[in-house]
Amino acid sequence: MSSSALKKWEIVIRFASSIPDLSLEISDAQTTTIHSLFKIVRNRIPECRDKQLKMVFQGRLLSPGFTVERAVRGNWQRDENDDPNIVQKAFIHCIVGPTLTEEELASQDQAQSGLNSNSESPDDLQNAQTGETLRGFDRLREAGFTETEVNNLRSQFHRLRGTNLDSLTEDAIREAEDDWIDNGGQNSSADELDMSYETLLAGVLIGFFGGAIACYFLWERTMFSLRMQLSILVGIICNFAYGLLHSYRW
């Protein structure tokens, strides 16, 4: 018997509203889909019976075609010597949307059944369900975030990371945001790494050769990112140290 079969799966559906948490024991997470969880929620919770439902795990919108195992992948890793009877638990947030008609609910079920019968991959399922694929922090709009909240989060994220938005393509920026949402920023792309080195080098050169003029950039926070400002400060310190050593030499 495989280790996957020995695991006990518990999914806790947590709602943004005052609806109590719904705990579900999943016997086969490899075949149970998010769409199946929609049906369970509608059957067990009267308030959700005719509502539009969306589920989010760690800031990532889950496609109805995803299996539970794929949706929470990485959350079940454990040592092989652990007790197989220990229940693995994950929390999935459920967003309750507007009321749907019976025709709309039936249409969703029919569309999902058709996708399952065609045996499409999870990525194809997601593309078929969402017409336009949202990337980066724009995905959070599906989770109920307003456009202002998304823009504020994006601005703060790139400011703290010192991202030079002018030197990156739109795809590279969205890729960095996707990486942070999906992996907690553990995996950085090569383009972003190269950009960070270029930013540090440019800042040090500005600080070293700019002299006192470079100090202006330390107070003008809207002109450069935090990472660039720190590298400029390093350049100024290097300039000061070089001048000090040069004066002692003479």
From Swiss-Prot:
Which Gene Ontology cellular-component terms appear in the entry? Dsc E3 ubiquitin ligase complex; endoplasmic reticulum; endoplasmic reticulum membrane; Golgi membrane
List where in the cell it is found: Endoplasmic reticulum membrane; Golgi apparatus membrane
Q: Where is the composition biased (Polar residues)?
A: 107-130
- Bilayer-crossing residues are 199-219, 228-248
- Supply the PANTHER family for this chain: DSC E3 UBIQUITIN LIGASE COMPLEX SUBUNIT 3, TRANSMEMBRANE PROTEIN YOR223W
The family classification in the record reads: Belongs to the dsc3 family.
Described by its record, this protein's role is as follows: Component of the DSC E3 ubiquitin ligase complex which is required for the sre1 transcriptional activator proteolytic cleavage to release the soluble transcription factor from the membrane in low oxygen or sterol conditions. The complex also plays an important role in the multivesicular body (MVB) pathway and functions in a post-endoplasmic reticulum pathway for protein degradation.
Protein's name according to its UniProt entry:
DSC E3 ubiquitin ligase complex subunit 3
